[in-house]
């Protein structure tokens, strides 16, 4: 039996963000996983920040390069999603510095940092 992939913190995964509303990110896109694999496996959920290929100066957008494409991690678009229903697929592992910075920004955003 082949083990099923369970996302872990620091993974960049492809994930379906639809349905969406208003200014939320939509469609299938990459996202940075913030939650640990133990939580993800037990809950069936992951907390992620979507990535965009647009690079606009914004306080909660962290610059990132994935597959030679410059973009940004949208920290203030933090979202909890069912990773199975969203068809999460591993793309690559981010650098630990990016994960740590994203988590720090989330803390600032929520006033817990």
What are these model-derived regions, one by one?
Residues 1-113:
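Conserved functional hotspots at enzyme active or ligand-binding sites that engage polyanionic ligands
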